[in-house]
A protein has these predicted regions:
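Positively charged n-region of N-terminal signal peptides that target proteins for export
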Residues: 1-4
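Short, solvent-exposed turn/loop segments enriched in Gly/Ser/Thr/Pro and often Arg
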Residues: 165-168, 223-227
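Glycine-rich nucleophile elbow surrounding the catalytic serine of serine-hydrolase chemistry
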Residues: 135-136, 224-230
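Non-catalytic, mobile gating and regulatory segments of ester bond hydrolases
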Residues: 20, 143, 217-219, 229
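A generic "alpha-helical surface" signal
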Residues: 193-200
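Non-catalytic accessory segments of hydrolases
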Residues: 7-193
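Alpha/beta-hydrolase fold nucleophile elbow
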Residues: 125, 206, 213-225
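Core alpha-helical elements of the protein kinase catalytic domain
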Residues: 113, 200-208
Length: 230
C-alpha cells in the first residue's frame, strides 16, 4: 500500500509540473531588457552583452554547445561556433523538446544563463543549477520560476543554470545510430547519455569562462531540483 501511495504521489507531482510548464508557455511576452555596456564580457567563443537588474548583472541564453540537430542529433555536444560581434544575451533560450500534453521546445536548446552579484571583492563562489522534471520535461527558466536574480544578490554568488537534452533525445542508444558515415564520431558519441554529456559540457564552459563573469572556477557547487539533484 505504501509503495502504491508513493507511486501515486510521484505521478501527481509529475502531472503538476507538466501542467505548470505548459500554462507558463501562454504567459504574455514582456519587453526585453535593454543591454548594458558594463555587462560586455568575453567568452572563449565570442563576446556577450547582458543587462543589469537591481544589483545583479544578468546574461541569458548563452550557447555552450552547437545546436544538436541533423548530424549532431544523438551525438556528444560539440563546441559552439565562434562569433565576433557581441551576442545579445537578454532572453532565455528555447527549452529542449518535450511533451506529455503536446510537443514544445526546440532542438536548438543548449544554452546557459548567468546571474552575478555586483558586490566588490575577490572572485565569487559559483552555484551551478540543474533543473528537474524527470529528465523528460523542464528548462533552465521554467516559465520564469527559476529567475536567479534574488539568489545571486542575497548570497553574493554567481548562479549558472542550464538547458540539457531531455527524453529520447537526451538518453537513447541504438546500433543504427552508429551506422551513419555522415559525421565523424567523437569519443562519447556512442554513450547514449547525451543529456548528461550536455551538463558536463556546461561545466567545462564554466571552467573556461566564469572568471570573466566574476566567478571562481575553483569554487563551483553543483545542485539541482528533483532529477537535477540526483
Amino acid at each position: 500500500m505504501k509503495k502504491v501511495l508513493i507511486g501515486c504521489l510521484g505521478i501527481l507531482l509529475m502531472l503538476g509540473l507538466t501542467v505548470f510548464w505548459y500554462l507558463s508557455r501562454f504567459d504574455s511576452e514582456q519587453d526585453l531588457p535593454e543591454t548594458a555596456q558594463s555587462t560586455l564580457r568575453e567568452t572563449h567563443t565570442g563576446p556577450v552583452l547582458g543587462f543589469s537588474k537591481n544589483d545583479v548583472n544578468v546574461w541569458l541564453g548563452i550557447p555552450y554547445a552547437q545546436p544538436p540537430v541533423n548530424d549532431l542529433r544523438w551525438r556528444a555536444p560539440r563546441e559552439p561556433v565562434s562569433w565576433s560581434e557581441p551576442k545579445n544575451a537578454t532572453q532565455f533560450g528555447e527549452a529542449c523538446p518535450q511533451g506529455a500534453l503536446g510537443l514544445s521546445g526546440s532542438e536548438d536548446c543548449l544554452f546557459l544563463n548567468i546571474w552575478s552579484s555586483q558586490s566588490e571583492g575577490s572572485s565569487k563562489p559559483v552555484m551551478f543549477f540543474i533543473h528537474g522534471g524527470g529528465n523528460v520535461i523542464g528548462s533552465a527558466d521554467q516559465g520564469g520560476l527559476y529567475d536567479g536574480q534574488r539568489f545571486a544578490s542575497e548570497h553574493e554568488v554567481v548562479l549558472v543554470s542550464i538547458n540539457y537534452r531531455l527524453g529520447p533525445l537526451g538518453w537513447f542508444s541504438h546500433p543504427a545510430l552508429r551506422e551513419t558515415e555522415s559525421k565523424a564520431f567523437a569519443e562519447d558519441d556512442n554513450s547514449g547519455n547525451y543529456g548528461t554529456l550536455d551538463i558536463i559540457a556546461g561545466l567545462k564552459w564554466v571552467q573556461k569562462n566564469i572568471s570573466s563573469f566574476g566567478g571562481d572556477p575553483d569554487n563551483v557547487t553543483i545542485f539541482g531540483e528533483s532529477a537535477g539533484g540526483w
